[in-house]
Each structure stands twice: as C-alpha cells, then as structure tokens.
Amino acid sequence: MARILVGLSGGVDSSVAAALLVEQGHDVVGAYMKNWVNDEGIPGECPWEQDIQDALAVAKTTGIEFRVIDLVDEYRARIVNYLIEGYRAGYTPNPDVLCNREMKFGVFLDYALEQGFDYVATGHYARRMDTPQGAFILRGRDPNKDQSYFLSLMRPDQIARAVFPLGDLLKPEVRVLAEKYGLPTARKKDSQGICFIGQVKMSDFLRHYLPDKPGNIVDTEGRTLGTHNGLHLFTMGQRKGHGVASPREGVAYVVVGKDVRRNRLILGYEDASTRGLYASRAVVGGISNTLAPLPARVMAQPRYRAKAEWASCEYLEEGKVRLGFDTPLRALAVGQVCAFYDGGKLLGGGFFESIEP
C-alpha cells in the first residue's frame, strides 16, 4: 500500500476520493491547500474558512490526519499574476488548467514528496494508466464530468505521481458513496468559479486589479459602433454585455477580435462567413506531452466541454505545432489551452499563440 496525500477542498469529490483510498488500505493524510484569501475587498464570497471546516470534518469521519498548507504566496505568484497579465495583454488565460500543473501537482506535490508521500490524490474525474513507456491520462468514465482537459499541461513526472480515485465513477455514484461513508459533504453543492477563488465573479476580480481602459467598439470594417470599458472584460464569441444592438434581425453581434494596440473591440455578425469568428488553423505553443511527440493527426479540444475535433498537426519548432482543423472552430482565443487526444487518451496540451482564418 502507498502513502498518499489527498487534497481535500471541502467538496464532495475530494471527500469521496479520500474515503476510497482509506477503504483500499492506503496510508492517507488529508490536506487543504490554502491558496487564496479575499482580504482586498473584492465583491463575492470566498468561503475558504468554511471549506477548511468541511475538510476537517471529512478527515475526522474517515479517521485520517488533516493539515492546512499555506500556499497563498505561491498561488499569487504562479496563478493570479498569470491571470492578470494575460488579460492585460489581451489574452484569454485559463487559470484552472495552469493551477493543476503549478499548484496541485507542482508546489503541493513537491511538499508531498518532501514529506515522504508516494503520491498526491485529487477528486478529478480522470484516469491514469501505467504502461512500460510511462504513465498517461485517460478521460474519466463520466462523459458529463470528465476533467482530463484540466490536466492537459501536466508533465510526465507529475502524472506518474498522481492518483485519481474517481476516474471510473459517475457523479451520481460519487454522491451515493458519500452518503454510504457518512461524509458531512455528501449533499454539499459543487463549487463554481475561478480555481480556489470561490464565488468571485471574473469581471469583479479583474476590475480590482485592472482599471477601466475605455476604447472604441468597431465592426469588421472599422466603423465605430460604441465604446467599451476594457478589452479584458470581453472574450471571443461573446454575444452579450457589449451593449451594441445588431441591425440584422435574428443575427447577433458577437466579439470576433481585439485590437490591443488601438484598444478596439471588434464585433461581427454571428455568421460562418464573418472574418475572425471561425478559425481553420492555429499555432499552439508551450506544449506539454505525456509520452511522445504529437502525431500528424490529432483530436484537438479548444476548451472545457467543447468537442474534440480532428486536425492535422505539423511541428514548427520544439514545443510548437500548427494545427489545421478539418472543420473550422468557433471563437478561438490566444491564451486558451488546447488539449490533444487520441480517442480517450490525453496526449498533452499547450496554449494558442496565434489564430488563422
């Protein structure tokens, strides 16, 4: 049996993960990663104190040791700064994906290894498979909860130390197990929002760090349609919130681009022919592969819950590929994470660096 440090978030998924590992006979210790404290007056609830109490109650119920690990400084340096600077530059960051590589299976894993643990376990709906060539990640059994996308930037050495007890379970089965084990989180609602920041709205979070920067809203021909308060408040494909009514009945205006240099938000019609809305090619960099270089044909998933689409894959240089999508993809954004699959097998992931029509 292994010595495993399980990340207890105070939610039902990590609670059941811990209970399963105890039932399997492992030497389990639970730890809450204290990554964020909303002490700067940002609107919204960040219930970390209640989450700690819930995690502690789970540890008592399962009979395991419980620790609170203060990672606030590391989280700010690795995740919050990445998020703020990405939006400042006009990108669309994905803190939840980076959080897994840098925090849960980065700083937290380093702590675990220093403390003599063999593995780190989380409540992700994903599976790990070991082969003679190394370990890789498979999609979770539950197609509605599969979270392998969020693990797509993990390095091979991190995957080898990861345990996902919920990978073969459906979400309803997890709820049933939580009741069976008598866990105090059995009926707790799933959390939403930015990784570890709770119910804080992204717009409120960004406004706290990035002051309004008014600019013009234009159409694809450069005609002025209105004004905006900051490019960081908008994302590609966004239909609402820009305040511009479409002159075409039944066809909405959507965000199709950002001109960062001139601080202009570009709108176009929700139409396949609109320049900038659909992409047939893209360059992906910062690639983290699990086992081997990407093949010439891959399935590319551009965001969580999006369908993975077939694409040609050409290496440009180390860590960068150009994708050619069989079917043009809607509203891709620089900075988003693209995950690569071979069926249900996760091959790795990277960041969109440029988008081509």
From Swiss-Prot:
Protein's cellular compartments: Cytoplasm
Site positions for Interaction with tRNA: H124, Q336
A cellular component annotation (GO) from this entry: cytoplasm
Binding site for ATP: G7, L8, S9, G10, G11, V12, D13, S14, M33, G123
Keyword annotations: ATP-binding, Cytoplasm, Disulfide bond, Nucleotide-binding, RNA-binding, Transferase, tRNA processing, tRNA-binding
Disulfide bonds: C99-C195
Main localization of the protein described in the UniProt heading: cytoplasm
Annotated SUPFAM superfamilies: Adenine nucleotide alpha hydrolases-like
Residue ranges, annotated region (Interaction with target base in tRNA): 94-96
Region (Interaction with tRNA): 145-147, 303-304
Matches recorded under Pfam families: tRNA_Me_trans, tRNA_Me_trans_C, tRNA_Me_trans_M
InterPro entries associated with the record: MnmA-like (IPR004506), MnmA-like_C (IPR046885), MnmA-like_central (IPR046884), MnmA-like_central_sf (IPR023382), Rossmann-like_a/b/a_fold (IPR014729)
Residues forming the catalytic site: C99 (nucleophile), C195 (cysteine persulfide intermediate)
One example GO MF annotation: tRNA binding
Function: Catalyzes the 2-thiolation of uridine at the wobble position (U34) of tRNA, leading to the formation of s(2)U34.
Protein name per its UniProtKB record: tRNA-specific 2-thiouridylase MnmA
